[in-house]
Amino acid sequence: MNSFLMHWTYAIPEIWVLTMACVVLLADLFWGDGLRDLAAVLTVLTLSGAAVLTVFEMGQSGTAFAGLFVLDRFTNVAELFSYLAVLMVVLYSRRYLVDRGIYRGEVFVLLLFALLGIMVMVSGGSLLSVYLGLELLALSQYALVAFYRDSVMATEAGLKYFVLGALASGLLLYGMSLLYGLTGTLDVRDIAADLVNMTAGNLVLVFAIVFIAAGIAFKLGAAPFHMWLPDVYQGAPTVVTAFLASAPKIGAFALIIRLLVDGGYGMQESWQQIFVALTVVSLVVGNVIAIAQQNIKRMLAYSTIGHVGFMLLGIVAGTEAGLASAFFYTVVYTLMSLAGFGMILLVSRAGFEAERIDDFKGLAQRKPWYAFLMMIVMFSMAGVPPTVGFYAKLAVFQAVVAAGYVWLAVVGVLLAVIGAFYYLRVVKVMYFDKPAPDAGLIVRDDLASMALSINSLALLVLGILPGPLMAFCFYAMRGVI
């Protein structure tokens, strides 16, 4: 009986989020028309409650439900950062959704179900639970991307995402099925133990690793599996894009940890070489093609591909320090992307999407504070000290050099310098170009403005004092290998 209760105790945050997602849906159904903010308020309460429950679990470890669920340091820390990302999206979203007539409870319900999918992925101890979490996240994302039915671009982006996402899920599932056929178990720890005794030349095992790596690369947005990313980021409502660029990246990182580190560490040399190729291609494609973009959402999409390349440097290192630096980079990228897309949301207004880089011309004259915040974001993405983006890049470079991949670090540094161009171009447009004649007024939004200020200034504060966040990420990854 005590063991049974302990199993449910481990999963209390997930149960809380699932229950509250249903409550938000029902509350919006019965009272949503009269109380327009009800769903958003309940969502914030859900995230706050989940954070409290997760904090109470800190320090505990174990498995539950016959190995389907794993509670460890990484589970707790990754879930906390996921709550933060979804909270920021909710705070940024209100005026944008109201202006477009889509401020409805379904948006927040889908966000909560997507969050639940991330939580299940992060805590998955079995191929089955990891895949179920992945599909829950993916289905919620497809619906969110196509939610704005009046937008042809959103509908088109949703269809593209669905078709390519289904293909990637199929690849991942096929790789998992091959692993199951080889080992006869779904438990990732048992799979890892069985793989130690297998030869690297086993053809079925090679195919399994390739298919799983391809599926993970798609979910991350790593090149050459990035085809969906620019179109979906550009076509989706900016609120949804802000979500896609943040919390799901933590979930994708969890896929690597659970499937390749926990489940395939015995075959590290095999999947490491695949990720070396993914890293180089992502760095080149993301940073070079972003230079040619005039649409800022599309530019940030290609920059995401580049950032994924930097994050994969830590994965390639394959050490505990490398994985911790990769997790640190993922968290920092999440904060940077939230601030970047949050600024696009603030500059947009009813009937106008601030999607072109030219829409930010003269922002320093129109809204000096917003321009300053956006400058911090761009500097952090470029890796300019003293922003936290610099320390994130430095951490992965140190890890990959320590692992013996000096040439890979050199490639990363060169492409970081190239990538700085398109970030600094946005700063130049804001400070040195005159506002366009049709620029219009920026509508005041106190809640989103306060959230953006905290988000952007955090990039500067964490750059001056990176130690606590870095230590927290290292704490999460301790003992993973």
UniProtKB/Swiss-Prot annotation:
The keyword Transmembrane applies. Keywords: Cell inner membrane, Cell membrane, Membrane, NAD, Quinone, Translocase, Transmembrane, Transmembrane helix, Transport, Ubiquinone. It is an enzyme of class 7 (translocase). GO terms for cellular component: plasma membrane. It comes from the Bacteria. It is found in: Cell inner membrane. It is a multi-pass membrane protein. GO terms for biological process: ATP synthesis coupled electron transport. The chain crosses the membrane at residues 11-31, 38-58, 69-89, 107-127, 128-148, 162-182, 203-223, 237-257, 271-291, 299-319, 327-347, 370-390, 401-421, 457-477. NDH-1 shuttles electrons from NADH, via FMN and iron-sulfur (Fe-S) centers, to quinones in the respiratory chain. The immediate electron acceptor for the enzyme in this species is believed to be ubiquinone. Couples the redox reaction to proton translocation (for every two electrons transferred, four hydrogen ions are translocated across the cytoplasmic membrane), and thus conserves the redox energy in a proton gradient. Belongs to the complex I subunit 2 family. PANTHER family: NADH DEHYDROGENASE (PTHR22773). NDH-1 is composed of 14 different subunits. Subunits NuoA, H, J, K, L, M, N constitute the membrane sector of the complex. This is NADH-quinone oxidoreductase subunit N. The lineage of its organism: Bacteria, Pseudomonadati, Pseudomonadota, Acidithiobacillia, Acidithiobacillales.
